């Protein structure tokens, strides 16, 4: 069973426990990022947004793989903003990356012409899917894609992740919410978790 306090640190890391959870994220998420970034199918001049960048592992990987991408990110943990900014200083200084601190649902700092938007292990922390998916749709250019990685519902149940922190969505619920938001060509597959792709 995951204690509620620890679970909340995965949602919004802060303080010393936040640093610990950040280090754990780096180790646990590496392979998931490898697969998700492969699915992004990076192209020259892509403009990319990560929602919930954590310590900045994924965006750093993208910056290292494709020097022509413009990379933006937003996270509502001030600690993660500080750590990710430090970890990606060279890309930020070079003007290739821009990181924001805040809630992506209410912020006005993001653009509306991203080629790809992605999030990894974030969806559980949204109490409903209608508003987040509508927001993502508004941030994408026509033909742009939204990529999600999430642990499957059964895994979260077995982990005994607290319901007060983790929303244990089924793949059916996610697909239905994506369709309702206006996404098309929704694809998903399972590989030690669920990978989902949807097109605007």
Spans of features found by a protein language model:
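A short glycine-rich, Lys/Arg-flanked "PGG" loop and its adjoining helix->strand segment in the class I
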Residues: 130-142
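Short alpha-helix
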Residues: 166-181
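Conserved beta-strand signature within the Rossmann-like core of class I S-adenosyl-L-methionine
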Residues: 143-150
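Conserved SAM-binding loop and adjacent beta-strand
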Residues: 17-37, 167
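A short SAM/SAH-binding and catalytic strip from SAM-dependent methyltransferases
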Residues: 116-128
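Core SAM-dependent methyltransferase catalytic element
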Residues: 183, 189-200
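A short acidic, Gly/Pro-enriched loop at the edge of an enzyme's catalytic core
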Residues: 105-117
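Class I SAM-dependent methyltransferase SAM/SAH-binding core
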Residues: 49-106
């Amino acid at each position: 069973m995951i204690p509620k306090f620890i679970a909340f640190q995965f949602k919004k890391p802060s303080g010393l426990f936040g640093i610990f959870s950040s280090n754990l994220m780096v180790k646990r998420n590496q392979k998931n990022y490898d697969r998700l970034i492969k699915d992004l199918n990076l192209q020259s001049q892509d403009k990319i947004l990560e929602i919930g960048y954590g310590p900045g592992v994924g965006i750093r990987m993208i910056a290292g793989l494709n020097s022509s991408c413009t990379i933006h990110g937003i996270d509502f943990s001030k600690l993660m903003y500080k750590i990710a900014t430090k970890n990606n200083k060279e890309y930020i200084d070079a003007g290739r990356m821009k990181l924001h601190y805040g809630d992506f649902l209410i912020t006005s700092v993001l653009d509306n012409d991203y080629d790809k938007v992605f999030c990894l292990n974030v969806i559980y922390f949204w109490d409903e899917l209608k508003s987040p998916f509508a927001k993502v749709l508004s941030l994408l250019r026509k033909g742009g894609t939204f990529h999600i990685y999430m642990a499957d519902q059964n895994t979260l149940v077995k982990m005994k992740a607290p319901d007060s922190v983790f929303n244990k969505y089924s793949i059916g619920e996610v697909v239905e919410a994506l369709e309702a938001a206006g996404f098309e060509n929704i694809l998903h597959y399972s590989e030690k978790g669920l990978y989902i792709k949807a097109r605007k």
